[in-house]
Design a protein with these regions (language model features):
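Short, exposed coil/turn segments at beta-strand boundaries within extracellular/luminal domains
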Residues: 39-45, 134-142, 230-246
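A short beta-strand segment in extracellular, disulfide-stabilized domains
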Residues: 1, 71-83, 172-182
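Conserved structural position at the C-terminal beta-strand
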Residues: 36, 130, 225-227
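Exposed beta-strand face motif in extracellular beta-rich ectodomains
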Residues: 28-32, 122-126, 217-223
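Proline-enriched interdomain boundary motifs that mark the N-terminal boundary
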Residues: 54-63, 152-164, 255-257
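Interdomain boundary/hinge segments at the C-termini of tandem beta-sandwich modules
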Residues: 48-54, 146-152, 249-255
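Surface-exposed, flexible coil segments in extracellular/virion-facing regions
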Residues: 4-24, 95-119, 195-211
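Solvent-exposed loop segments of extracellular immunoglobulin-like
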Residues: 1-4, 81-96, 183-191
Length: 257
């Protein structure tokens, strides 16, 4: 018997005694015809058409995000659907990585959009995997990743009269000065006494007496601050700023003898 394999009705791939053959390069829509010639001279043939399971990933948005540590990323939405063969079945799943997809985790299946359920503390990339299934053959392609950059909270230590301490006793009429060390020039601050806001400021120092605050004798006060990583906007904290709260300092006021 003789086996004759023909590409697109023109090109002979093999013509001989072997019933199998191979070819490294084939294209969508190519046809392969196999002709079997028996010793008797009878000829039978069959033709198959090759359909390539092409998939080109869609796009997702936003391109990148920047959030504060512990915040939840905004929803990542599918902008365009993948390009596939019209006869293919399409599905999706999502992946997350903190090392540029050297390693990654599969995190959700068969959704065009993705909402991360919790806050994150490490810069993370997310991408969608678009899957095409056609005639039992599964192929996939990944979208360009969305990078969610995590900004570390601002740092600083609250001092009173230049010293870090949990509490201080003052006499009536004394002027405790509070400062925050360890910050950067672009930070801003909210200083509070007994949870009430006394001032918003771009400077890391707080003189409550100069602002008219009176420490009454026999009363205990708690002073703390919030640090923002952006300057004030129209005298108020920037709502987009990342924040960090200092520890509190207890002020015990005694009457002057």
């Amino acid at each position: 018997a003789n086996y004759h394999f023909i590409l697109n009705g023109i090109t002979t791939i093999q013509n001989g005694a072997s019933a199998t053959t191979s070819r490294s390069t084939l294209n969508d829509g190519d046809t392969i015809t196999a002709e079997l010639t028996l010793v008797s001279g009878c000829v039978v043939s069959a033709t198959v058409t090759l359909i390539e399971n092409i998939v080109t990933a869609g796009t997702i948005s936003p391109v990148n995000q920047s959030i504060c540590s512990g915040a939840t990323p905004t929803i990542i939405t599918g902008v365009t659907t993948p390009t596939v063969n019209p006869l293919a079945n399409v599905s999706h799943y999502w992946q997350a990585s903190t090392d540029g997809f050297a390693t990654f985790n599969n995190i959700m299946s068969n959704t065009e959009n993705y909402q991360h359920p919790t806050g994150i503390t490490t810069t993370t990339q997310f991408r969608r995997v678009d899957v095409s299934e056609l005639n039992g053959q599964t192929c996939s392609d990944t979208t360009v990743p969305v990078t969610v950059s995590v900004n570390a909270p601002p740092v600083g230590n609250l001092l009173v009269n230049g010293t870090a301490q949990a509490s201080i006793t003052i006499c009536t009429g004394d002027t405790p000065i509070f400062t925050i060390t360890g910050g950067v020039a672009s930070n801003s601050y909210t200083f509070r006494i007994n949870t009430g806001v006394v001032t918003h400021t771009n400077t890391p120092s707080f003189d409550p007496v100069a602002l008219g605050y009176v420490f009454a004798p026999g009363v205990t006060y708690s002073v703390d601050a919030t640090i923002y990583n952006k300057p004030l906007v129209a005298g108020n904290p920037d709502p987009t700023a990342c924040t960090n709260n200092t520890s509190s300092i207890t002020i015990i006021t005694e009457a002057t003898p």
